[in-house]
Amino acid sequence: MDTITVVENVFGEVERKVQKSYWEEHSKDLTVESMMLDSRAKDLDKEERPEVLAILPSYAGKTVLELGAGIGRFTGELAKEAGHVIALDFIDSVIKKNEEINGDIYKNITFMCADVTSPELKIEDNSVDIVFSNWLLMYLNDEEVEKLIGRIVKWLKPGGHIFIRESCFHQSGDSKRKVNPTHYREPRFYTKVFKECHSYDQEGNSFELSLVTSKCIGAYVKSKKNQNQICWLWEKVKCTEDKGFQRFLDNVQYKSTGILRYERVFGEGYVSTGGFETTKEFVDKLDLKAGQKVLDVGCGIGGGDFYMAETYDVHVLGIDLSINMVSFAIERAIGRSCSVEFEVADCTTKEYAENTFDVIYSRDTILHIQDKPALFRNFFKWLKPGGKVLISDYCRSPGTPSEEFAAYIKQRGYDLHDVKTYGKMLEDAGFHDVVAEDRTDQFLRVLERELGETEKNKEAFLADFTQEDYDDIVNGWSAKLKRSSAGEQKWGLFIATK
């Protein structure tokens, strides 16, 4: 055994002893308060338990492996529909309490006292439909997390799912702790580990994890204005060459460095035209009232959402298909104490109940959507009567675009319409009082200002980014100015009422 392996084993053993001691200390009272480490646990549990369960795919008749099951907050709920639940925890008194609570009611639960990091834990490959873990990985060191995820992927059947929920950045519960060995990581650590995990079956087929969704737990945002409770749902899929639109956004158009350089141009918190200036102008048109609920489609890194929540005391749900965008948004939310939650979601497949939102807001995002009429029908359904939609978006002039502009549209994967047609699509979806304004003159002024500021501050830009980044911005803005000045590229503002 080499020196590195010996050191890793020693650190691993110390980590397990520390974590076991911590949870033995906090498991003396086998209550929901001690498990959640919060004096308001009963109220939080009432809010968050249905929210968490609603994120899961159907588990009716399925095999569910619950890691870190505790005293069974979720065990009984899972057992109501699952074919078989394997509930596992590494504290003996805790799993016995779980069995005492749920064992007589549900005969489809197997209770196990085991440490998820132990090589002695044997779960058959391709035997589990869903792995469910609520507050577990934060009690493992980085190496243990990586090894466990690798094992979980093997345990899962193809098409199976992993749900994890972790406290990130800092603690949430108010329980006093003599020591706290919890690893409060940035969410991007978990995202990276899951995205980089691969496994192979006996036939040599390669499998990876595809993100279904990632979001803040809304119950904590509402009750504590705390965005650090993050969950992820992943699906085990066969590796393919075509990684889909989400991978395109995160690896091509909205890479982390690309997002940061966009923010440098648009202003802190913003990745859409005009930054704070246009956000304030447009949001002020909505006549927002305290307590209203806003859906931001294509929320980016959250600047507009923070502005709405902090200025008007509304609750904002920001969704974006880009994992990178949402990761930045969540990081920027920490410490702001505002009622904003974020979720990685595809607006074309996401479903909300009818009459959920007072306002739906979207800035320079719907240009990516090919079937706008279907999306606008959903917007109409999701809005409350009297609710408003506000959209700014790239548009084009009527008629056939030039070869150069057509190539740009194709390369970006955009679906662009003229301003009048765009407004008509909103009318056809059922909206009234549709305002469809050509804001291209404003677009040109903003582009000129942003380009001028970038060129003026070239030295500062190059201190943080590369020459290639600088050239991409300058060339991109110059090209937009050229297309818009020629009358080909347009910018529209649309406001409509249900």
UniProtKB/Swiss-Prot annotation:
Keywords: Methyltransferase, Transferase. The keyword Methyltransferase applies. One of its GO terms (molecular function) is N-methyltransferase activity. Gene3D superfamilies: Vaccinia Virus protein VP39. Inhibited by phosphatidic acid. Phosphocholine binds at S167, S172, G173, R177, Y184, Y262, Y394, Y408, R412, Y414, K480. N-methylethanolamine phosphate binds at Q253, Y254, Y262, Y394, Y408, R412, G413, Y414, K480. It catalyses: phosphoethanolamine + S-adenosyl-L-methionine = N-methylethanolamine phosphate + S-adenosyl-L-homocysteine + H(+); N-methylethanolamine phosphate + S-adenosyl-L-methionine = N,N-dimethylethanolamine phosphate + S-adenosyl-L-homocysteine + H(+); N,N-dimethylethanolamine phosphate + S-adenosyl-L-methionine = phosphocholine + S-adenosyl-L-homocysteine + H(+). CDD domains: AdoMet_MTases (cd02440). Changing G298D: No effect on catalytic activity. Pathway: Phospholipid metabolism; phosphatidylcholine biosynthesis; phosphocholine from phosphoethanolamine: step 1/1. It is an enzyme of class 2 (transferase). Induction: Induction by cold stress, salt stress and abscisic acid (ABA). It comes from the Eukaryota. Involved in phosphocholine biosynthesis. Catalyzes the N-methylation of phosphoethanolamine, phosphomonomethylethanolamine and phosphodimethylethanolamine, the three methylation steps required to convert phosphoethanolamine to phosphocholine (PC). Belongs to the class I-like SAM-binding methyltransferase superfamily. PEAMT family. This is Phosphoethanolamine N-methyltransferase 1. It comes from Triticum aestivum. The lineage of its organism: Eukaryota, Viridiplantae, Streptophyta, Embryophyta, Tracheophyta.
